């Protein structure tokens, strides 16, 4: 296939086929090259791969861990424990079945599903999950790359990006992510990287693939597990250390969950999403199902429950924040609505734009995208600078993989400004503060609530300064309501080319106060369609305000005949609009040339799920005063308005018999209409309630009220106060259940602020130890320490001097190994920086690089780093490919080591072609041709 753009200056690209490089027509065996060229076409015609089953099961067993252990043992399984935070769900393992098989397991152990204590089980399938980094085109590897962080400096005179994300402006206001914890769900992070180590948080890290607490990536020659380390640097690379870059939240804590470097199953994803939800604030994920233009996939049953647990229970009930990359399948015509992770109401789906504000070639369009950041673009546009594997830096990070950690870092700045933001508050803030700026898209529209929105960029480019300023004064939005409109289960044929329209008229659950939705947030369409070629479908939703959301675009590569079964499409384009009215669903079938147009699809059923609030999310209305008859109070009343003209003739009521009995002791001097406390005309002490709740006289006000002696009324305390001295939130004396009394401010809070902890027995916020930034249960039981202290066994210990490390076993500072300048432990393998005259090799400091390595200067490091020579070199100088000696079985050709091997089937003409075209110097061709020729001499 010809290249998509002219090659950049540099080394000559490898030949495409033998016949195009001077080989005569008589050259032998050209069929070898034809076979190679034909392979992609053959592979594309293969049927989709069959599912791969593992020897792991997810099982729901009631009765607790003991019951699960007994059930597992009875059927030959091992119970590996509860799955994350999901009660009654357990991870079973069977050692006597195939580790990986295309057939689901059979045998006596399958009787497990008939056990009466087993409510549900699922043999785990391997899920394909790909890292969302745009593929590099080797034609442009030698193009110049800007080494500065251009996306932080768009205001510079010569910058091509005209609009700022205003990260520096947020920093200038004092927000750098302090006390916020972000975790990267990926292939691990290099915790000893000099730019990550200062902010690395072991408590926010775990290795799900290896089942231990070290999230370090697996190292190999290809460095394929670099993705998580790159994402982590964008969030929280340390500042002012003369190394690599500055992270967006450079004072935030950064952790890593290693979960992509192995079989990814529903259990693996659920465990990863549920790691320490009350400690980790933000989870960032730059991966998902294949972006191949034909896959429809999303979270399984367990992962969905983990998402729900996180938003309900995470961050002490405020909700975990999940940030997701929207996908890189633009070149394949993919649509991110077919990705159940970015299409979820629980995730913040983030898109990308180029430095010029253009649509990147990898971008996927869909209605669930919330916001956008800068990232890479065409080969001539700059990429993103960040940390890289083996303590390096890179200026080549690309794709929407960049955008998710960028937004995670910006949200960390907002959480520092206001740590009481809920997961929905954060989404509202992004909607309010993101802006179209100079982002170019033909589909920008203003929705019914006045928000400008696009399928490419959501609500636009994130604005860090606007986000922190809005967060600082933010009031929590009202509670979320969910209204399910009646499902339309009438099957309808989908006519070819024409548009099938069906409507749903809803009052948005106005009859149910706990479900009523007036102002929209997310709108979900749950739909089932049968169709001979799924990729020919287009689906739109039109709101009562007229906003049109594209739920699905045509996908040329999706030839599946599976259609959709209860698939949920989500749109945020109706955010802030009124929910009540007529909704229109449009389904269009545009048949491709490879399909018989006479075969029609069928819309089986669809339903509408509305999420939002019953009250306006951004305004508070004062309650109207009751116009009904009230008890006479000892305060002056307003004079009634004078009506123009003669007053109307009042009807003369029948005379009622006047009460002459004894009044209640709490009745005042104006008497009563009966003997009870709710029949007084005025009160001795206080009146309680109103005309709707039968106002009565009381001697003292109950809990939740205070006595207004001037008005002789019981007035309600501020929300959360149990006893108080006034209506203000700062006049609380004690708090209701679920709140804690902050004695220094006399307020009632659901979470104690930094520096205080919640005492459950007294329901008080008490001060942590002076060394603690955050603590739990006790003054000295720390989770975060102040500057100058380190966390050890729940206590804050003073930081150690250079050349020493903190020994958590002995609770003191210990000496580093003599080869280390700085370290994390006593052995030579635990150095961070090396002592003078030592080099860094394989995580150790050595006096000289070993055989097969060469020394290289690293900017910002006080020592050299030993780099590995090419795999065939015994030794090299200055570069990995500049071999000076070769391993046994290899011959030196220039600066390369080539296999010293002959084969009887290579004739002189073929070998001459190999030599003349210097194919053996190109690694790609070593296996194809070099082993067939004797090249020595």
From Swiss-Prot:
Residues 1-22, 621-656 are annotated as: Disordered. SUPFAM superfamilies: Galactose-binding domain-like, Growth factor receptor domain, Protease propeptides/inhibitors, Subtilisin-like. FU repeats lie at residues 660-707, 711-758, 762-806, 810-855, 863-911. One of its GO terms (biological process) is glycoprotein metabolic process. Transmembrane segments: none annotated. InterPro entries: EGF-like_dom, Furin_repeat, Galactose-bd-like_sf, GF_recep_IV, Growth_fac_rcpt_cys_sf, Kexin/furin, P_dom, Peptidase_S8/S53_dom. Belongs to the peptidase S8 family. Residues 899-937 form the PLAC domain. A motif (Cell attachment site) lies at residues 534-536. One of its GO terms (cellular component) is cell surface. This is Proprotein convertase subtilisin/kexin type 6. Its EC number is 3.4.21.-. Serine endoprotease that processes various proproteins by cleavage at paired basic amino acids, recognizing the RXXX[KR]R consensus motif. Likely functions in the constitutive secretory pathway, with unique restricted distribution in both neuroendocrine and non-neuroendocrine tissues. Residues 149-468 form the Peptidase S8 domain. Keywords: Calcium, Cleavage on pair of basic residues, Glycoprotein, Hydrolase, Protease, Repeat, Serine protease, Signal, Zymogen. The gene is Pcsk6. It is an enzyme of class 3 (hydrolase). High expression in the anterior pituitary and in several brain regions, the atrium, and the ventricle. GO terms for molecular function: endopeptidase activity; heparin binding; nerve growth factor binding; serine-type endopeptidase activity. Residues 680-898 are annotated as: CRM (Cys-rich motif). Residues 476-616 form the P/Homo B domain. Glycans are attached at residues 240, 882, 900. The precursor protein seems to exist in the reticulum endoplasmic as both a monomer and a dimer-sized complex whereas mature form exists only as a monomer, suggesting that propeptide cleavage affects its tertiary or quaternary structure. Interacts (immature form including the propeptide) with RCN3; probably involved in the maturation and the secretion of PCSK6. Pfam families: GF_recep_IV, P_proprotein, Peptidase_S8, S8_pro-domain. The lineage of its organism: Eukaryota, Metazoa, Chordata, Craniata, Vertebrata. Residues 1-45 form the signal peptide. The propeptide domain acts as an intramolecular chaperone assisting the folding of the zymogen within the endoplasmic reticulum.
